[in-house]
Each structure stands twice: as structure tokens, then as C-alpha cells.
Amino acid sequence: MTWQSDYSRDYEVKNHMECQNRSDKYIWSPHDAYFYKGLSELIVDIDRLIYLSLEKIRKDFVFINLSTDSLSEFINRDNEWLSAVKGKQVVLIAARKSEALANYWYYNSNIRGVVYAGLSRDIRKELAYVINGRFLRKDIKKDKITDREMEIIRMTAQGMQPKSIARIENCSVKTVYTHRRNAEAKLYSKIYKLVQ
């Protein structure tokens, strides 16, 4: 996603965070009309497969679209969005390139589960499975980003060069490149392409 200015970016993030905290906004990003409409209809459609009422889902859950368009925002501001959804049941909808990051946040945060949009034969069943609280660590389908890889991804997303990252992480530049290469293999993309 390309931002016009830092002000525009900050406003957009604050607007997203406000949307998440409002009780009537349980799907993020509400600005992605197709995702919002599609997921809203899908949740209503699977009503008979889930144990909770639709009202409880709207009140207690937040469904987050981890699309490649928004990954930069999630990576750079993961403490902010994770704080904003504290106390909610968070369900991550992960595209292929965001699966490893979704797994990282699942392991390191209070995430209810991950729906792998690219792998799912029946997304209705996958979504119901997660909403019903059945998603467990054994259900992780792909690799996860390690803590060290995540630090390097964050710093790369901020525009830092490998030498600077190596100094901060107290490691060699070669180690930075190794972690970056490993992360890129898990993300099916170069980091700089995901965080543009």
C-alpha cells in the first residue's frame, strides 16, 4: 500500500484502530469493501455450523484480513493493533504470503485462530472451526516466522540497512542476510515487496 505522507499514514492507522475498538466494527479492514461484505455474508451463512450467536460474534470477535496490501501496517505497528484488539477473540484470515506471519502472531499473541484462505477447500468449515475454538497449534499448516526473523522484518520494513540491523541485533551482516532469506522463503516474497 502506498501512502501519500506520514500524516496520511498515521491518520489511516488511527482510523483503523478506532474501527477495531468500536463494537459495530468486527471485521478489519472495513475499508476493503469486498472482504467486509464477503466475510459478513459468510459468517451469516455458517450460522448453523457455529455455537455462538451472531450477536456474540459481532460483539466479541475481530476478523482481520492479513492481505499483502496491509502487511506493512501490521508489521510496523503490531504492538498497536495487538493492543487495540486486546480482550477480543481475534481471527486472522491469512493469504498465502501472510501465513507465516499469521502463525507468528498466533504463537506470540492471544489470537483465537488462523483461517488459511489460500489452502482452504471449504472456507466455511475452516471459519466455523476457528470461531468454535477448535483451532490448536497442531492445526498450523505452514512454518512460522521466528522472533529473530520478525525483528529483522520489522527493521527492514522501517528502511534499515543490513549493517545497521547487524549492529542493533549484535550479529554479523551475514546472519542478517540468512535470517532475511529464511523469512522470505516462508513469506514466498522478498520482504521489501511486502512492506512497500
Swiss-Prot record:
Gene from which the chain derives: ecpR
Database matches in Gene3D superfamilies: Winged helix-like DNA-binding domain superfamily/Winged helix DNA-binding domain
Record-level Gene Ontology MF annotations: DNA binding
Residues that span the membrane, as ranges: none
Induction: Negatively regulated by H-NS. Positively autoregulated. Also positively regulated by IHF.
Primary location class: cytoplasm
Domain HTH luxR-type: 138-196
Family: Belongs to the EcpR/MatA family.
Protein name: HTH-type transcriptional regulator EcpR
Pfam family, one: GerE
Any GO BP: regulation of DNA-templated transcription
UniProt organism field: Escherichia coli O139:H28 (strain E24377A / ETEC)
Keyword vocabulary terms for this entry: Activator, Cytoplasm, DNA-binding, Transcription, Transcription regulation
Localization, UniProt: Cytoplasm
